[in-house]
Amino acid sequence: MRDHGCHIVFCPDPTPTPVLAHAIIHNKLEGGVNITASHNPAAYNGLKFSGPDGGPALPEITKDIEIRAAALADDGVSYHDIKDDFERLDPREPYFEQLKKMIRFDVLTKAKGNFAYDALHGCGAGWLDRILADHGMQVESIRTKRNVLFDGTGPDPSEDNLEPLKKLVIEKKSLAGLATDGDADRFGILDRNGAFIQPNHILGLVFDYLLETRGLKLGASRSVATTHLMDAVGKLHDVKVYETPVGFKYIGPLLRAGKIIIGGEESAGMTIHGHLPEKDGILACLLVAEMIAARNASLMDQLRDLFRRVGSEFWPVRMNLHLPDETQKKLPDRLRENFSEFAGHRVAKTDRTDGLKLIFDDGSWVLMRPSGTEPVARIYTEASKPAAAEKLAEDAKAWITQ
């Protein structure tokens, strides 16, 4: 890049994607590149490109990059000695100052207990735990050392991957378990008893909490695959909830327009008003910690109270299907079919924002779509009871694979 006339600013240490995003904005740069597999296993290592606003690049930009990269790969690339004389950048303090504007640390530090943190061998280590410790909080941390294979699994803060954190939470009697993925843009949360709290539920809780505490009557943005608990919270507070296609890049414009107090996706992405047009797992974990300190209640107790206040329960399910090539190729055409009924449920609304989403007359729903990043089909469902959501997911699986 330098040989092509670009001025390069280099972060010499592993840097979380949201920190890079903030550095782009803070230093008025034209963009940034992070080499990461994100939440995926090491074999998926690639690059993330962020634009001048710090947000994920839009599809037309990433597609152009892919075409140019493929052409370079076909022609062959010659390398020569690279002088290690780039301008160094330490983005830590400016980013921490930004977090101090977003988080009420005076509230968080009143928490009566410790927090457990799992870095999953990702670059969130030394960031989330550091800022908590800097404010006098007791933090018990695990998997903070560099491991390029992530223990042979992947740095996804999913329920299955957080078993070591669960043991730590129970052993240390922590108020909650906090986790970030490989590049620290996604979050994972465990309650004080070690129970995994779905990212969907965290989004609903934080949305409600921000409206109660920040003095801003703004709406929320959620992807088409994300819980309708967000809509229920919006209705409770009389604010609008915007639906977008899957992909955090679609949330940024609403944030910049000042229309939303929170933007989120069921895949554990979150940002808030005044912050970055990029998901930030560090921020999300800090908001959850602040919320626990402020309400002095477990997350499940808070969720039950929220269900009571909105008048319904919301239980989402997500399923990934690895399909034969032939089935995968046919899926987009099949998703164009029209339904008046699906698996015994009467269809009240069909949404084709991203894939096929069928909303039923009882408020439950199913979304089926091909993944944009992996060779799989994704199924998302939601119902007022966990068993009903599971059944819907199985019905969708049967339809796709028939």
Residue ranges and their predicted role:
Residues 1-45, 131-190:
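N-terminal small/polar loop signature for handling phosphorylated ligands or for N-terminal nucleophile
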Residues 56-58, 141-143, 195-214, 281-287:
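Gly/Ser/Thr-rich active-site loops/lids in small-molecule metabolic enzymes
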Residues 170, 175-176, 212, 216-402:
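Phosphate-binding and adjacent anionic-ligand microenvironments
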Residues 20, 33, 39, 65, ...:
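Buried hydrophobic positions in well-ordered alpha/beta secondary-structure cores of metabolic enzymes
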Residues 45-169:
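Gly/Ser/Thr-enriched, mixed-charge loops and adjacent short helices
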Residues 2, 12-14, 67-96, 191-264, ...:
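Proline/glycine-rich low-complexity loops and linkers
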Residues 15, 40-41, 120-125, 184-185, ...:
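Gly/Ser/Thr-rich loops at beta-strand to alpha-helix junctions
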Residues 49-52, 188-192, 272-273:
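Short beta-strand-to-turn element immediately C-terminal to the catalytic PLP-Schiff-base lysine
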